[in-house]
Amino acid sequence: MNETEKVNQIVSSLIPNVVQIDEIEYLPGGYNNDNFRVTIKDEIFVVRVVRDPRPRPFEKTYVSLSIAPELIALDTSNGHMITRWIEGNLLTTTTLSPIEGAHYLRDLHNAIPSSITRYDVIEQISHHFDSAGQVGKEQPWLERIRWQEREIRGCHNDLNPWNIISTENGLRTLDWEWAGDNDPLFDVIGFCYGAHYSHAEFFLCAETYLGQRVSEETLRTTQAIFQLREHAWAIAQISAGNNHEGIIEQRDRSIANVEQLL
């Protein structure tokens, strides 16, 4: 089945009354999924075609939030999804100041419900190492980092600039696959890395978000655990055959960052 046939099949299953798709355009950039801009009777949607279909019992809660694109349909048994197209610019092409970033993060977290599901960073890292055939090799890193969660609340956990769109009505957040309760400072750090902030700007964003001082140790260990998560995800993807150049680069860059932080 080619891409066009796959998109048609998903649209037909999720929106049964659709008779004809007028246009299908592939959207580059997805590492885990394939995304398509689809036009149906002058309306524009995004169809997410997942490469690894699996049940997603909690994701619908997050993708239904007003801070996400409007949800049209989601198959929670496999993850295929249709949302309404949003006009705007990804944060890959525009930037927020550290203070603007802190306000975005605060609004984001205030909108995300807690107690839906848990995103345990340590468990995720261990799972990725296991999937890559490197069972237990994360432990020396974890022992050196000694990261401790400060508080737990609903988080996004993947705030790279490709997942945030600046629109005329404010910021909208995409890709809620990994949402769940976690330390919100993990989200802050992930956002700051994506924004390419300087060391001082990391502090400014984190302290503006928290409304209090942040110790060098807290910032450093959270940066390190975030980078180890990025490395762990990359080695798992590569082990599964996803040899995208960007993933290989992430594997090498993130573990080098961990070394530098330690």
Task: Name each model feature, range by range.
Residues 3-18, 111-157, 161-162, 167, ...:
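An alpha-helical support segment within catalytic cores of ATP-dependent transferases
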